[in-house]
Design a protein with these regions (language model features):
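Short, compact, well-ordered microdomains
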Residues: 43-65
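The feature represents the first ordered module of a protein
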Residues: 1-38
Length: 65
């Protein structure tokens, strides 16, 4: 996993913690709180392609299966 993916994973995990593991709600939370991230976190996440973000989400959701 790249540094950028780790930043994104940590961000999504923060959202999941707020919603008891609900991935869908966590992604909404992430969208609503994106501007509150530091510049370096936003830049790292913005560098990710859709495929790279999906890889992170896939990894997180496989834990619950």
């Amino acid at each position: 996993m790249t540094h950028e993916q780790i930043e994104y994973r940590n961000y999504v995990l923060q959202g999941m913690a707020s919603y008891g593991g609900d991935v869908a709600q966590a992604l909404v939370w992430c969208g609503n709180h994106f501007t509150k991230l530091s510049n370096s976190q936003r830049n790292a996440i913005n560098k990710l392609s859709a495929k790279e973000r999906n890889q992170v989400i896939h990894e997180l959701t496989m834990v619950f299966m």
